[in-house]
């Protein structure tokens, strides 16, 4: 019997709220010797972790459910909240079920967090995942292949057996299937945003940070089948793209507030690891070379990734607006997020030249006052409707 929408969303919400990662503990306990590797936003090659027989687990901070006490002692106050809440998770034992942590190349703060983790958790595997700033296969490609090879060898030692090319190819195929399902979810949401609200889509995506990819793919398919059976009212809301939330995630209440203000979010950059690679990775040939080519030539465009050409800045954002039929863009970035806030003026300039309406605000993962954001988003939605009617 197919699961009901209520059961699917209940499962997703339970995974989202569980800061003790009980689902990970249960996965490990099911087969003795299993290992879990945590990773932070924005992107890591999860295929390598999966091919090693381990569970990749997205660590997206403590959200608005946890008070940060110990974590504040390791960082100054004028930075984003996610590194401090992640430290709080570690220092309070909530991440003890992780056998290692991967810290992607996002910003200086996360790079420094990887060093803190090495000092504080000496019994855990820790690696900073550097990525190329040069997109030539012979330069940046070789560098990235080397980085992935080091990770592959390290995880092989941790697993007690080498990570083979065949295992990598099989994992690439698994994640290709997952990316297809995620894209189907986003396409459906863009076509019927009243039917699949972003507050639900977000929970379904976040479940994929905890579940094995095979289970997450099935969950998405089940959600799409279940939500299609619902009868939900269509409203005259403004269609918007929400961008800037690629690392520290907004509280769920903020997403709901934007929707309640009269906006349909038809594209976003939440949980970007799910959509970082823009198409399928060939599951034949040299797996690390294929993963490298996908990153260099067919990956997303965000503030944490270097743009080689000035004219490329904002190209994918404009494409997203047009492809998903959006009427405007909401820039929602965490306070003190240097990559997002430094890039914002450049993207706003691109949108202005394209006559695409936009507005902007900042948040923290524990933002509690939603009224100002709801009022701003509502005013933006109203102005879009007035402009389009003029």
Outline where the language-model segments fall.
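Acidic/His-rich segments in extracytoplasmic proteins that coordinate ligands and/or metal ions
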Residues: 85-157
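Redox- and metal-dependent alpha/beta enzyme cores, enriched for Fe-S-associated oxidoreductases
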Residues: 31, 42-43, 48-60, 245-309, ...
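Glycine-rich, highly charged phosphate/nucleotide-binding loops
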Residues: 74-92, 305-318
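TerminUS-proximal long segments
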Residues: 314-328, 332-390
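Metallocofactor- and cofactor-centric catalytic cores in central/energy metabolism, strongly enriched
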Residues: 16-29, 33-34, 38-42, 46-47, ...
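A charged, amphipathic alpha-helical module
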Residues: 2-35, 145, 149, 153-280
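Short, acidic/turn-prone active-site loops that include or flank metal/cofactor-
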Residues: 60-66, 131-134, 269-273, 364-365
